[in-house]
Amino acid sequence: ETQVIWGVRDFAARFGRKPEGMWLPETAVNIPTLEALAEQGIRFTILAPRQARRVRRYGSRNWKDVSGDRIDPSRAYQLRLPSKKTISLFFYDGPISQGVAFEGLLNDGKRFADRLLGGFSDDRVGPQLSHIATDGESYGHHHHHGEMALTYALRSIESGDVAKLTNYGQFLEMHPPDHWVEIFENTSWSCAHGIERWKSNCGCNSGGHPEWNQEWREPLRHALDWLRDTLAPAFERRGGESLKDPWAARNDYIDVILDRSSEMVAAFLAKHATHELNREERVRTLKLLEMQRHAMLMYTSCGWFFDELSGLETVQVLHYAGRAIHLARKALGEDLAEPFCERLRNAKSNLPDHANGEEIYKKWVAPSVITADKVTGHYAVSGLFEAYGDQTRIYCYDVTREEYSVETEGRVRLAVGSARVRSLITTDENTLGFAVLHLGDHNITGGVREFQDQNRFHELREQLKTAFTQADTAGVIRILDEHFRKSTFSIRSLFRDEQRRIINLILQDALSSATSSIRAMYENQAPLLRFLNSLSVPVPGAFLSVASIALNGQLQQALERPDIDAAAVQGLLREAELNHVNLDATTLEFTMRKRLEEQAAAFEQKPDDLCALKRLHGLLDIAAGLPFHVGLATAQELCFARLAGATANGNALAQAAAANGSRNGNGNTAAPTTQNSDAGQQEWSRELSAVREKLCFHGTT
């Protein structure tokens, strides 16, 4: 019930109206689920054809068996529920959906359109619906350029006179069901055994590792069920101390999830709280509700779908469980981690390195739990590399600086301060003191903890400053160890994205120095390399390595220049070929592609800018001369509308381009003569034709 309510409210918040239909994950269905949909005003959902059991026409008493994918997918059906409510059901076209997902139907937009139209039949009477259900990833991720095939197919159908595009709501409005249907309960579209894929080793898997088993699914399910059933009564009992109806509050908690502002939280608590809550009660109540949120998230279907317990999808559901356990520890005072891990121990990984669910949980989930200490440690370290203001946001935490000072001596820096950390999710606040010592490069050490007595914090600050100003680095480290003991951190304590950014900053100087040295080595040895090549003498591997690093680096820099020198690029390519250097095609292609996309975007914004058009033409020439393929898809998409409409608006655009081209070096416009204007228009047209040709728009007029 809660998840259906959340889905309805989320849709309404984003689109300004209530939804008419709702997709069931994996089309997994039973009657209570359909009752929950109908109760919230959902008119329809979509199922797989094999989930239909039997149908009968309105007014008829004769049921027709349609099991085994034999239902007619071209109409809507009505299902009568035990509550006397009804819900409409659509059953997608199985063969066409299968063709999209697994048979390469998206390789050809025309064939895709024809197949969709082939879903209609002259043997049927009345209006027909041709429709499919597939993963969204099919269009571009699983099938490269699948979104283009979809676009072509929809445009082709829309421009023809055989059918018109519609949606389920409109079709229901125009052609209400005239057949009843009954379904097979506890079935889905992706498990031949009903819904066993989400609780047992039923045999359904990706097929990528036939030697593996999925015996881990059952104990994983049991562990999560135990956690859910342990948290639910505790939530009801403890939540009842501050909430009139904890379960009704959970239903409405979606309003807070969608808007974490203090105003929304206050309005939510005003509606549901038994009394005006103090700060501690408010924080505990929000933690309980967030605990329930994660107790639902941990049932995300992909956690069981794939083959291995240590897969990222399954680890993610364990992360959700870990968050629920962490919140339970804070809000209920109960530590459920060990009994949960005992149950996970029965879930065996197919990979010896991971053993079982307990080891996976302790290796990846437990260390990732975010606390105010970790946020403060992240703030302290990252503050050495970027200037934070008095207030900053780190993910879902607001950090307010209370005190902060930095001492510098050469490459060594010492930062000491305190900050108030507030969770935007639970509104929990902590004020923590920190100190961090950066010895240069990646050598960072520090500590963070709560100081009940501010005088103790100030004493620490003065001790550290004294030791630092006396160049007593060992003394600084000793003081940090004494005051922070186990609450220490390093660059490893940073959240992953920021960790990589800072490591890249640290590496820049080292890389720059190394690259300069290697380039100098190559330039010194280049004549010898040419001589060896002229004699067909094998070049020593060490020389080839130096040449590879130097030439790939120079090419990278050449392609990154604001105005790429085509001759310089060609010269470097010839030199690489002469020295038998393997180009770093992946990195160079990415750089060239991004340059093209940037220039294509500039042309898309200003199609009358002759200079932008010329730069795009030049970049396309350079890309064509590279000894590897450069992807043009995004550049094509950016330019398509402009190129397709260029002929229709050609004169106006050409005149504007000619006028733009007449600007002198001071940015002033000289009045163009008719002759100059004609020449400018002709130049723009030539450039446009060249760009169109190089982007492979041969038929665009």
Residue ranges and their predicted role:
Residues 21-30, 50, 169-172:
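Short, solvent-exposed turn/loop segments enriched in Gly/Ser/Thr/Pro and often Arg
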Residues 50-52, 56-71, 384-412:
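Extended, Lys/Arg-enriched charged tracts that mediate electrostatic binding to polyanionic substrates
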Residues 525-654, 677-701:
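Extended alpha-helical scaffold segments
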